[in-house]
């Protein structure tokens, strides 16, 4: 059957020798097979962002890269009238199955794929009392693992965004992958997208304080902002130690904390805040202004409901995440290091629709894991950020009180080498 995938594979193999060339340094005797398990496959959903990178390829360092793994099956939990999966299946020659198990077994009686792409984002699911959308990532993961157990074989699993809205389930997912011995990767595109400037947190840096300024809603964009923070913080001296306490603030409480004296534990560093705004490419301006630093009065006028998450790490390091809708529409980071007088600061660059190339940066890392059997960075990062979101939303719902988080004592070491895109 001649379809788009077969044409691309043949053309790519002729042009680049993909049939015999090593992929990420590992020679392949045959092309690997990928199952997509997703909640929704509609325009601008995460399946559209990410799964389709394995159908049509993606730009990689100035070339169009065709992954050496084929989507051979899919399970789509919710399929409204604008579901794209039937059309994509016809175009690229894969099958959409009615259950997760059938997708992993490709309609047979044994697992018949080499990797699983789990995307539990978008779709119509209920909210809990803390404002968390109850995406069935844990339930879908459990169905995947059930096939692994029954068939006596595992594969790498990539999980998009949070592991779960419930920390106990998120931890169980990570523990299960470790117990069964399969590689697992998860999280946001923010840690692996381009940065402006292209800087990395020095490995084993002594961080005194850090700040992320971002935008968007809680339970969605706060996760991306926390992943932005965590990919830098985990490189500090001693490695990641986990989070001891979190306090979420909103409205006037945020402005009061921002007015606290410099160096006070009641707020955060104005110098870091200025560094973040100075890196932003979307800083709001008054009518007829070109590019001016906003006054406190302007910020209060433009940002109707600021949100702050104040984070205390087990080792005593402090960090803050700010959602400042109306002031910025990007993600910036700044940190005070013992080794330098000026803050280390950067913007995490997100290319716009329709190409949203930052998702290709994430899928390149997923592809590396699928091909090599080794996760490029620790899944524990996303275990921690998943728990941070839950704790912060519980703090917001509980009167903005500081919450001790003994469950979030997630310690781990990340690799020295960077994984974000530079060119």
What do these predicted ranges mean?
Residues 386-404:
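A contiguous, mid-protein "functional segment" used to position or interact
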Residues 6-25:
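N-terminal export signals
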Residues 1-2:
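N-terminal secretory signal peptides
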Residues 142, 152-233:
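A contiguous active-site-proximal alpha/beta segment in oxidoreductase catalytic domains
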Residues 34, 121, 162, 187-190, ...:
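An acidic- and aromatic-residue-enriched active-site/binding cleft used to recognize and process polar
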Residues 211-214, 224-353, 360-380, 389-392, ...:
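Contiguous beta-strand/loop segments that form the cofactor/metal-binding neighborhood of enzyme cores
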Residues 46-47, 133-141, 186-188, 221-222, ...:
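Phosphate/oxyanion-binding active-site loops and adjacent basic polyanion-contact surfaces
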Residues 12, 24-155, 165-172, 178-179, ...:
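N-terminal glycine-/serine-/threonine-rich beta1-alpha1-beta2 phosphate-ribose binding loop
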């Amino acid at each position: 059957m001649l379809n788009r995938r077969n044409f691309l594979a043949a053309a790519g193999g002729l042009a680049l020798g993909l049939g015999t060339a090593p992929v990420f340094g590992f020679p392949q005797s045959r092309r690997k097979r990928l199952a997509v398990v997703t909640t929704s496959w509609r325009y601008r959903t995460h399946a559209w962002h990410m799964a389709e990178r394995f159908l049509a390829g993606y730009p990689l360092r100035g070339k169009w890269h065709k992954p050496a793994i084929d989507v051979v099956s899919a399970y789509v939990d919710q399929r409204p009238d604008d579901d794209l999966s039937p059309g994509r299946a016809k175009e690229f020659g894969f099958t959409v199955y009615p259950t997760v198990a059938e997708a992993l077994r490709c309609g047979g009686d044994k697992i018949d794929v080499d990797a699983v792409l789990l995307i539990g984002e978008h779709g119509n699911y209920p909210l809990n009392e803390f404002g968390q959308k109850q995406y069935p990532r844990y339930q879908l993961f459990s169905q995947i693992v059930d096939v692994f157990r029954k068939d006596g074989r595992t594969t790498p699993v990539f999980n998009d965004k949070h592991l779960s809205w419930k920390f106990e389930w998120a931890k169980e997912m990570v523990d299960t992958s470790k117990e069964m011995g399969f590689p697992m990767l998860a999280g946001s595109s923010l840690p692996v997208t381009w940065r402006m400037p292209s800087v990395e947190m020095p490995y084993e840096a002594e961080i005194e304080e850090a700040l992320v300024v971002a935008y968007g809603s809680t339970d969605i964009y706060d996760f991306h902002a926390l992943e932005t923070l965590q990919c830098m913080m985990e490189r500090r001296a001693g490695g990641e130690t986990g989070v001891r306490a979190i306090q979420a603030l909103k409205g006037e409480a945020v402005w009061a904390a921002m007015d606290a004296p410099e160096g006070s534990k009641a707020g955060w560093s104005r110098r870091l805040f200025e560094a973040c705004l100075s890196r932003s490419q979307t800083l709001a301006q008054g009518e007829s202004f070109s590019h001016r630093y906003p006054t406190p009065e302007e910020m209060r006028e433009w940002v109707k409901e600021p949100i702050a998450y104040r984070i205390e790490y087990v080792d005593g390091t402090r960090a803050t995440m700010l959602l400042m809708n109306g002031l910025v529409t990007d993600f910036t980071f700044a940190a005070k290091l013992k080794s330098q007088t000026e803050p280390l600061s950067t913007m995490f660059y997100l290319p716009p629709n329709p190409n949203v190339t930052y998702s290709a940066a994430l899928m390149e890392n997923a592809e590396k894991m699928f091909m090599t059997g080794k996760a490029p960075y620790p899944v524990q990062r996303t275990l921690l950020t998943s728990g941070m979101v839950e704790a912060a939303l519980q703090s917001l719902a509980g009167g903005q009180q500081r919450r001790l988080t003994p469950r979030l004592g997630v310690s781990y070491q990340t690799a020295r080498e960077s994984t974000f895109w530079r060119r």
